[in-house]
Amino acid sequence: QAGLILSRYGGPGSHRYPIGFSGDTIVTWESLAFQPYFTSTASNIGYTWWSHDIGGHMRGYYDEDLALRWLQFGVFSPINRLHSSCNAFNSKEPWFYSPETCRLMKQYLRLRHSLLPYLYTMNVATHEEGLPLVQPLYYHYPNQEDAYEAKNQYFFGSELMVAPITEALDPVFHSASVSVWFPDGVWYDFFHDWKYEGRGKLTVFRTSQDIPVFARAGAIIPMDAQPQTGVDLPEMLDWHLFPGDNRSFVLVEGEGDNRVETRLTVNWDERKIRLDLTGDLALLPEKRQHRFLLHTFETDPIIVGNQSQEIAMGELQSHPIAKEDRMFELLKSANLAYDRKNELFAACSTAKDWKQLMKIITPLEEGLRQRLFEVIYSSEENEDL
């Protein structure tokens, strides 16, 4: 509950203690499109607590799509701060917008609060190790040109990679795009478990409900299972576990010498989870529980008590991502002729392999072709695709 200062930027040196912000932003898509780059590169001079006026500060125009996309980016920013001028028509409260936009805004604000265990741990790493929460990709891939070209893409802590949507929804397909560079390895869509092989750039598409957030293979993300408006430590922690590499994550709670560290070690080869607690356990809720969510698998969550222990994952059955279902949803919401939708879906769903699928989608117009290609790419296991 330490105090914080929000300050204007006063040149190098002024960044060491306060929260900064990117100035009085104009309410436009162009202004939003600059913010992810501005936020991630602030880390280059150690300005790790960098913020922006979510939704834009002044002027501009009323645009619910813009307001929602800015808020989604704000949830995956160092500081989540809605703000505007005193113009009564420029309010940023969720209930100022339509019921559906309001619902999505509230959903994302709750997501932000559920991320507090992860965010707090990452900010401890900033304080003690100088590691920013938001990092440009070239911090990890300094010798790859693609890392410098992906200006609006960044790492959000040690486990997640984010590529905010900064353009309006397409009126035909009701989704918006962003070009994403996937580094080597496997990446999973955090919300849907779609699998992306890291081998280059791909245009990805998301409806208003989603922002592109990707978990690296083996990612471990601790979250509050029952987020409230207070600052009490969670009664139950959700550990989101993504398959792949054997890795560990150390969750930090409390501060200074008066803190608890919970180390979670996941061994996918042996199907084991190791939970180790050190520090002043009296800081934690008396009935603390841990719930393990094994992404991409058809298995019930594993729930255990708050003591050091080893947990067996048991038999794991992969949860298939049905590309036909995704294609159907894509076509269902598109403003295209019914007969064309029906013919295209029939052809795609009866294709024998990805090569046949590519023959079907290659002649299509760009917007439709790219959307279908993403579905195929993130649903198939074929390394030749």
What are these regions (language model features)?
Residues 1-210, 353, 372, 381-385:
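Catalytic-domain carbohydrate-binding cleft regions of carbohydrate-active enzymes
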Residues 160-161, 271-275, 309:
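Hydrophobic residues embedded in beta-strands of well-ordered beta-sheets
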Residues 180-192, 291-307:
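Solvent-exposed beta-hairpin/edge-strand motifs
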Residues 199-200, 208, 305-316:
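Solvent-exposed, conformationally flexible loop/turn segments
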Residues 211-303, 315-385:
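Accessory, solvent-exposed terminal regions and/or long lumenal/extracellular loops of proteins
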